[in-house]
């Protein structure tokens, strides 16, 4: 198993997914270890200068004017974690929670947070031994960072809160335990937080970045899968390949469109179905937009998803706590890197971009099940009337598309003041992340429905064969889901194709 060396500078989004899913380990890079030590030494030195340093020997937020006696500084950090652990709702899934731990460790490895090496090593040991904090999804407004989610992470470090014990690769299901017990069972000991450490742990954008990164990576795969689903539908509807010609795309010059069209051309190469309706007997002039404009719509989605990638690729290596500790200059400086606006905006774009993959997919499903548009039996049903076929599968897709329209209302245009007005503009970045995650989940299901319905259409076009890559995907789908010869409970089929999507089994 690969071991990633965290330095706060070079972590990639794919590496985040690898650690989150247990496919890679993480350790502290030697150069980062030295930076962490120097940063901590500066914090310790400043404790002796008699000056007020925010969050080190003062209260927090609107309580920043309160000086804390030296004897109470450890208690101050513990109280910060305890008081801020006020999240509610379902816990983050294990992969997202592991991504959260990784991102916080990576940011601390930059050496500008004042954390002790021992505390950072405990975070990494938790990842290694499968101690995954129970982190409620809700309670963050995205500035000062994701305070509540990160406080729930920090609780486990001090032997409080709750954690799942889920060693990577273990066959047993995760066990939910008190945080201290989870550490003990994993052979780890909690830490007593020193000045600045509580603040270094809870102040940052890592929760929204963790959820957003995994949603983004899933959306990227779905953007490619949307081309496959669309190609399968096009074949089932005897649609034209001509709108995907490279000269059409070059005349506009949008990169995502060019990429999507090239993928569609590759998927559709060598199609018998396409050749069958190119002669003088074919009276179709133009296909509906949901077929003809796939490069434009899928391409725009790719471009929006790509914008989000750029933001998150920077954010996973970003120092976002406050204050920041700069040992080279000897300064400890308060700023606003904890504000999640860049991430919130990007995740709103991700949700909107991905939603269009589902919206156009649902319209293609309508083309398939509508006999006046497809020339196939109504709802692709055998003995229609007695059987309803895929009638309600299309309705399910429509329901998810409409749900996405609600979810795509941008979180980042909202703000609500908190902390007695000191935190008077916030990003709602975690809300944007959770919405984007659900939108992407809905897109996956809509594409699974399209693949299921399009496969039925291809069956009905036999003996003509589709393009080889479409035929290969059709064959893999049929290994799990048989042809619909009479009505059955379609939720099982939708779930089976959704699992194929999740496994990447249809990626060609």
Swiss-Prot record:
Contains an active site 4-methylidene-imidazol-5-one (MIO), which is formed autocatalytically by cyclization and dehydration of residues Ala-Ser-Gly. It is an enzyme of class 4 (lyase). Disulfide bonds: none annotated. Its EC number is 4.3.1.3. It comes from the Bacteria. It is found in: Cytoplasm. Keywords: Cytoplasm, Histidine metabolism, Lyase. GO terms for biological process: L-histidine catabolic process to glutamate and formamide; L-histidine catabolic process to glutamate and formate. GO terms for molecular function: histidine ammonia-lyase activity. Transmembrane segments: none annotated. HAMAP family: His_ammonia_lyase (MF_00229). Belongs to the PAL/histidase family. PANTHER family: HISTIDINE AMMONIA-LYASE. This is Histidine ammonia-lyase. It comes from Anaeromyxobacter dehalogenans (strain 2CP-C). The lineage of its organism: Bacteria, Pseudomonadati, Myxococcota, Myxococcia, Myxococcales.
């Amino acid at each position: 198993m690969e071991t990633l060396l965290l330095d706060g500078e070079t972590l990639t989004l794919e590496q985040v997914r690898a650690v989150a899913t247990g496919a890679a380990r993480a350790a502290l890079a030697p150069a980062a270890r030295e930076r962490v030590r120097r940063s901590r030494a500066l914090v310790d030195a400043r404790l002796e200068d008699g000056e007020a340093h925010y969050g080190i020997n003062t209260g927090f937020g609107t309580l920043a004017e309160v000086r804390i006696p030296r004897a109470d500084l450890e208690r101050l950090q513990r109280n910060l974690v305890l008081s801020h652990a006020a999240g509610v709702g379902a816990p983050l899934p294990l992969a997202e929670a592991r991504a959260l731990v990784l991102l916080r460790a990576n940011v601390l490895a930059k050496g500008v947070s004042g954390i002790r090496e021992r505390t950072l090593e405990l975070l990494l040991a938790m990842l290694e031994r499968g101690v995954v904090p129970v982190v409620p999804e809700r309670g963050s407004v995205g500035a000062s960072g994701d305070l509540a989610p990160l406080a729930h992470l920090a609780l486990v470090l001090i032997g409080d809160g709750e954690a799942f014990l889920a060693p990577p690769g273990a066959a047993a299901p995760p066990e939910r335990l008190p945080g201290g017990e989870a550490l003990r069972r994993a052979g780890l000991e909690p830490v007593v937080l020193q000045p600045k450490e509580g603040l270094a742990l809870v102040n940052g954008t890592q929760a929204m970045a963790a959820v957003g990164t995994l949603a983004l990576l899933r959306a990227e795969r779905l953007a490619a899968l949307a081309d496959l689903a669309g190609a399968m539908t096009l074949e089932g509807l005897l649609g034209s390949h001509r709108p995907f010609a490279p000269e059409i795309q070059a005349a506009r010059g949008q990169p995502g469109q060019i990429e999507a069209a090239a993928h569609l051309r590759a998927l559709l190469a060598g199609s018998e179905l396409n050749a069958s309706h190119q002669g003088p007997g074919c009276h179709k002039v133009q296909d509906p937009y949901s077929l003809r404009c796939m490069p434009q719509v899928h391409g725009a989605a790719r471009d929006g998803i790509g914008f989000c990638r750029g933001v998150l690729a920077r954010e996973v290596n970003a120092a976002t706590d406050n204050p920041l500790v700069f040992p080279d200059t000897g300064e400890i400086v308060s700023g606003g890197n904890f504000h999640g606006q860049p991430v919130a905006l990007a995740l709103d774009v991700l949700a909107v971009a991905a939603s269009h993959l589902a919206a156009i997919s649902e319209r293609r499903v309508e083309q398939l099940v509508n006999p006046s548009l497809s020339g196939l039996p109504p709802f692709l049903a055998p003995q229609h009337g007695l059987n309803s076929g895929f009638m309600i599968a299309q309705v399910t897709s429509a329901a998810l598309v409409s749900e996405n329209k609600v979810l795509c209302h941008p979180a980042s245009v909202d703000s609500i003041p908190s902390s007695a007005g000191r935190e008077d503009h916030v990003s709602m970045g975690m809300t944007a992340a959770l919405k984007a995650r659900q939108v992407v989940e809905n897109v996956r299901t809509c594409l699974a429905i399209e693949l299921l319905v399009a496969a039925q259409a291809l069956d009905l076009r036999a003996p003509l064969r589709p393009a080889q890559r479409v035929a290969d995907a059709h064959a893999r789908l049929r290994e799990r889901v048989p042809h619909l010869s009479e009505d059955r409970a379609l939720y099982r089929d939708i779930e089976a194709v959704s699992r194929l999507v999740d496994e990447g089994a249809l990626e060609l």
